[in-house]
Amino acid sequence: MKTKFRSILILRFSSIGDIVQTTSVVGTLKFYFPDAIIDFMTLSKFAPLLKDHKKINNIHSVNIKDGYLKLKKIGLNINKLDYDLVIDLHNSTRSKIILSSIRRIKKLRLPKPRWKRFNLFMFHLNFFSKNFSVKTRLQDPLK
């Protein structure tokens, strides 16, 4: 990433272990953009998990019961918050609805290896590379 970002929002709504793993991305972003404001959006029940993270400036929470219209409104409100970059580390229906309302902000999305994961769990066929790691995969959108 060669661009200078001043304000970055990371989206990851669940689950607890995945949210903890995404904090490695926060560290990477702070390394490359030490002066950037880095905010995090997650489900309200997971917000306390991140509240004392030294590299996260603000935590935005979403209620698990928020429907389509509420999520669209959240996306519209993000437009008003002056972010330079939104990184979707969940790639879920919820994050796609929110991102669909975001305009004039650069968006990066983590591709999910759904087919590989399905084959691994259902048929015990591992199509992941030998050096695959979740931590490395989380960094992919930053390349």
Predicted regions and their residues:
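Catalytic machinery of carbohydrate-active enzymes
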Residues: 1-143
